[in-house]
Amino acid sequence: MTEARRHDTIAIAILGLLASLLFLDVLLGTHNFYLRDLTRYYYPTKQVLRDIILHGEFPYWNRHFGGGQPMAANPEHEVFYPLTWLILLPSYDLGYRLHILVHIYIGLFGMYALLRSMAVRAPAAFLGALSFGLGGVYLSYINLLPILFCAAWLPLTCLFVRRFLLRPRLRDFALASFFLGLQFLVGEPTTVMQTGLLIGMYALYRGWYAARDHELPWTFAIPEMLSRVAFIALMSVAAIAVGAAQMIPAIDHVRDSARSRVFEFSLVSAWSMPWAKFAEAVYPNFLGHMSIDRITWYWAGGLYPGMGSPFIFSIYSGLLVTALMVAAIFVRPRGGRFVLILCAISLLLALGGHTPFLQFLYKAGIATSIRYPEKFILIAVFAVILLASQMLDRLLDGDEDIRQAALGFVAATTMVAGVIALSELTPYYNRTFSWLWGLNQSAAGGILELSRRDWVIALGRGGVLFALLWLFPRLRRRLWIVLAALFVVADLTPISQELNPRMPSDFFTGQPSILRVLPADRKPFRIFHEADWYGQEQPAKKYFSTGASVYWIVRNGVFPMTPVAYDLNMVIERDYDKTALLPTLDFIDSVWDLKRSGRADWWAAPMAMSNAWYRGVYRPFDPEKKRVGGRMELAEPIQFLEGEHHPRYYFADQMLTIANRHDFVRQLSTGSYSSNVAFVTAPAFVPARGVVHSWRETANTAALDVESIGGKGFLVMSVTPHKYWRITVDGRPVP
């Protein structure tokens, strides 16, 4: 084994060991990740996918959501992505945990391999991989699985794209297309777009320098740039072919879903990255903490109107990375301007509504169905880590200019932290902090204490890095590398723990006690979780202000989409991922228009049409808090009110013609009808009586034994209509 290979083996082993130690409790199954979409969406929906497959069907259709919704065509489910299939292991919980954790290792190892292919030596590549795989942006993706699954393959995609552009070989073309194709199989659009932008820009960069390296006029660079971009286009075509199983149905689904409609600009610009987040690259807790003992202490929530917290929890990749990036600005290495251009593009997109650019894209019809601009910070962070790793490699070679520039930056930022830490001894700090973040006196107490601690830690962090850089010429190189690695690990570990807190395993594997009020056989009915719509009402504000108990409230109240984990079917729920079919959206809009009409029993008719037997509403907060003795993790925030047991399949006893959705709402809000009424856009008729003797459903089929008595009947099926449904009567197709 060569020395270089030995160093690589050691580096890979340590990277794997560090990741395993950081997430050991998740690996062993004693705890699990729970933040945000993990609890409310991914853990339950992956169970649905697993159950459908294990029952011998292809997951075309998900009966649990909104009266039925496409599954395989919706990229949110990652049906065709190979690592999703880990959920088919005998233990679902183990498979679910592994299909998240494996991407941490892929990100770490892929980044290390990319840096090594760029002639960065093992120590610098190791620290660069740590800064990426255990950095703030990448670990923020753990609760955003489609983005995590795409971003994990970004380093390997770039590795083989770069190799091909430098020395074209079919093998590298194939591997670049394959790894990009894996991103298409996941189908997360913004991450795929960022990958495409990154490799496309790199192709232009390589073409430009192909002419410059031969001292040719700039006009010779144009054909070089275009030829390389053409190769990227060919790779993209090949990658789309790899991901065609997901891309073709996804594109088809878009036309029939919420994504076919223009989003309001307020939704498109939501979660725009605030300018203040730049400071997070130096001071990781400048804006607050995502989780301390399962409580969010994010004092800059006002910078995210309507959201209260960031989409990307942190952009911090380590103080060493930031210092080396700043040093690169001063020493102006080859590729430095290219990285600055990438950063400028990335930041312009990530700032979203804070600049006129997003408004321009929106009005031009380009950015009308893409949400949350903060996602686009990935390009900048990725490029910065690559450049910083190269600068570290030069520093280890004894480049004094880089060391001095980094030393100066660290000294300046440490002095700022020191001055602020000293100001904490004066009464002005509390007033200024509260004024800056808009905090009232009652809310500022614990936050102020945290903020004071953060600035002291920032002072210590900066002091340690300053000492490391100052001691560099005075220490043996291997000792300095070990100390630098320990510093980076110590710097990033608290962030990794804070961004991904855990819950005990029984949080997911146990069942909420409220389920005891529901029948054991849950196939014949659906639930309408009305309470989930009232996030700004007083009961919701009280229940969701219970600190460390907030996610227990979600779990114990079986808030959507958690009911599907307990074999419950939902209807009239919120479309969280904006992928619901258009008839579902129209029906939900009609339900809320009906409520706004002032009708007292507004929910009765929609529940009858939807086969909903139970309606979830909030319990009064104060009596429930008293009942559990203040231990809100034991609270049952929701009570399910049992209504009439409306069937899923029935014959209408009354038919009414409507012109459109608004006419439907008007008639419901002013009239009184049978619970078996049918509203149709075709001419109405007096339907004959009919009987549904029995019905049987699988994931993709429904078989009914029905009888129409004495004439032409009208069978109502409470299932979301879709263009690919096929209906037969006695074996004969019907329109």
Language model segments and positions:
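Conserved luminal/periplasmic juxtamembrane motif of membrane-embedded glycan-processing enzymes
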Residues: 2-725
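Extended, hydrophilic extramembrane loops/domains of integral membrane proteins
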Residues: 721-735
